């Protein structure tokens, strides 16, 4: 079984050799390594190629080099990697991170018995050279229902990052699950669509990935004020994607992922009033009535989300009027806690 490893490359000169060396040392050897040069202005690609050419470990591995004439974003790099991949499974690595020597072997082991849509491993965070506790994978073994996979995202037992997982290539390509160009938090949206479509997953508790926290990175440098519109765009993009995929998605999974993304949006500046937060969420929701009715098809869900069929002020008044009732209590907690 061939595994295609997709590595976008852009401004990672201090880290790229460590990343490539970790791939070269893999105990699992049926690998296709796709490096996508996103028009990096430094020596990252030069160092990567030299590392490959000088290592005797590269002889039995297949390498593919793709080049962008101009910088297009990590999302486009990953999409090009997906299209170029010929392996049965896909894996993404950020080029400033690195994997354990047995990473692919460990993640591929469960696939000897069943062709899971996703296999996820555990990981460790590194901050300035020190290993710190990450968001550990709170799952173990096989999960065979879409709604259970989605619930693991909602309850933070499964991380949203695309790296450190094997994805069934046919499943990804048949469902046309691609990254949106220049969308912030593209991992969140892509993972949301994957788990709303996947029917099986295997969780491996062993650490197989090392993630590097870099000073000044997108996620470490932004403020709450910058975070809000970006999170809103992710939620809006999720709704837009759902609109196009209704017949193929699990409704329970969609509702769980919606709650997970709402939690990200409501991390707004603290001076936001509850109504302003509610209004932001309503702005994101571009779904048609048909899609909303599909998502809320039980009577309980229809009443729980009835505010979404009303203008924003009336909708807010509706959920406030029901505050404290058993039906609405959980949703208010999701929106405003």
What positions do the PLM features span?
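Catalytic core of nucleotide-sugar-dependent glycosyltransferases
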Residues: 207-215, 221-251, 268-289
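Generic secondary-structure transition motif, activating predominantly at the C-termini of alpha-helices
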Residues: 52, 157, 176, 243-246, ...
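General structural signal for secondary-structure boundaries
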Residues: 140-151, 221-224, 267-273, 294-296, ...
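Nucleotide-sugar donor-binding/catalytic module of glycosyltransferases
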Residues: 1-230, 332-336
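Structural motif
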Residues: 247-257, 305
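Membrane-interface aromatic/basic loop that binds lipid-linked glycans or pyrophosphate carriers
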Residues: 272-337
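Amphipathic alpha-helical repeat scaffolds of TPR domains
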Residues: 255-266
């Amino acid at each position: 079984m061939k595994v295609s490893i997709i590595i976008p490359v852009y401004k990672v000169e201090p880290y790229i050799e460590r990343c490539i060396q970790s791939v070269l040392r893999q105990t699992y050897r049926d690998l296709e390594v796709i490096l996508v040069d996103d028009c990096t202005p430094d020596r990252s690609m030069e160092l990567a190629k030299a590392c490959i050419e000088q290592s005797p470990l590269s002889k039995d591995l297949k390498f593919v080099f793709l080049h962008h004439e101009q910088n297009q974003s990590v999302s486009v790099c990953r999409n090009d990697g997906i299209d170029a991949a010929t392996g049965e499974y896909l894996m993404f690595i950020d080029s400033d991170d690195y994997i354990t020597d047995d990473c692919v072997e460990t993640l591929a082991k469960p696939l000897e018995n069943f062709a899971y849509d996703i296999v996820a491993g555990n990981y460790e965070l590194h901050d300035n050279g020190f290993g710190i506790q990450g968001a550990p994978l709170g799952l173990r073994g096989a999960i065979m229902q879409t709604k259970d996979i989605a619930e693991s995202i909602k309850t933070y037992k499964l991380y949203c990052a695309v790296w450190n997982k094997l994805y069934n290539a046919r499943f990804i390509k048949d469902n046309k699950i691609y990254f949106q160009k220049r969308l912030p938090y593209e991992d969140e949206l892509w993972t949301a669509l994957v788990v709303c479509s996947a029917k099986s997953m295997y969780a491996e508790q062993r650490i197989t990935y090392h993630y590097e926290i870099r000073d000044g990175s997108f996620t470490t440098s932004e403020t709450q004020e910058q975070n809000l519109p970006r999170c809103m765009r992710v939620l809006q993009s999720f709704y837009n994607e759902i609109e196009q995929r209704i017949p193929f998605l699990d409704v329970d999974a969609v509702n769980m992922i919606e709650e997970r993304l709402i939690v990200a949006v409501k991390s707004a500046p603290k001076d936001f009033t509850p109504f302003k937060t509610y209004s932001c969420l309503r702005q994101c929701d571009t779904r048609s009535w048909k899609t909303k009715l599909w998502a809320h098809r039980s009577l309980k869900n229809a009443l729980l989300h009835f505010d979404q069929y009303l203008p924003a002020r009336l909708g807010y008044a509706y959920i406030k009027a029901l505050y404290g009732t058993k039906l609405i209590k959980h949703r208010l907690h999701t929106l405003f806690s």
